[in-house]
Amino acid sequence: MPFGLTNAPSTFQEVINDVFMEYLDDFVMVYIDDILIFSRTEEDHFRHVKLILTRLRQHKLFAKLSKCEFNRASLPFLGHVVGQNGVEMQQSKVQALAAWPRLTTVTEVQSFLGLANYYRRFIRDFARISAPLSELTKKGVPFEWGGDQENSFRSLKDAVKSAPVRQLADPAKPYIVTCDASDVGIGAVLEQESENGPHPVAFASRKLSGAEKNYPVHERELLAIVYALKEWRPYLHGSRFVIKTDHH
């Protein structure tokens, strides 16, 4: 398929989805030309790899051997490192964000937030932390770099550098949903117990709308709970879970 065509990525994605339709989310994930095969055992993995390579050959699609990695316990995939213990941020991306120079224009703010936002599921209260920077991207807002923006910039860098490995969800275990609300936004953490105590599965947050900022504290806390239940419905529906909030 020629490069540069507007619909080329979506068309190729549709084709590759059709090729692997019966295997998708069972033991393979595909994004454009990135193919990830995952298995519970080495024996299953050899069988899965053979099925995928056979299907590629049947459709006259070919993988470049030098770009393939086989039988790995973990590997990078779409900016993440995926392994049997969970999902973490790719170190090259962490280093890029940590070394980002001070922002001096709206365009630079947008670029920084664009990359940071991609990893918001690793950062607790991302919406609250990033609020002073995201305000600078609004139409008609003058670019003024002050203490709030500097603190936001540094806090996001620190959060990225200390981001935890997100544990893979275990449907057999109960979940812990911890919710919080501030004057700026609402956020939640989805966790499950592990040998070392509660471990994060995902983080979620968003800013409050103008009307929501006028809610009393207990209603903002309730809003955070409703938001978390909707956000993680695929995990929580039919599962046991506990909700924690700091408002009584």
Regions found by a protein language model. Give the residues of each.
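Two-metal-ion RNase H-like nuclease active-site motif
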Residues: 174-181
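C-terminal reverse transcriptase regions that engage the nucleic-acid substrate
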Residues: 7, 15, 23-26, 31, ...
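RNase H-like nuclease module associated with reverse transcription
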Residues: 111, 117, 214-248
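Secondary-structure transition/capping motifs at alpha-helix termini
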Residues: 22-26, 55-64, 192-199, 231-239
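Active-site palm subdomain of RNA-directed nucleic acid polymerases
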Residues: 9-47, 122, 126, 230-241
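Acidic, metal-ligating active-site segments
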Residues: 183-192
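A short, polar/acidic, helix/strand-boundary loop motif
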Residues: 1-11, 196-223, 247-248
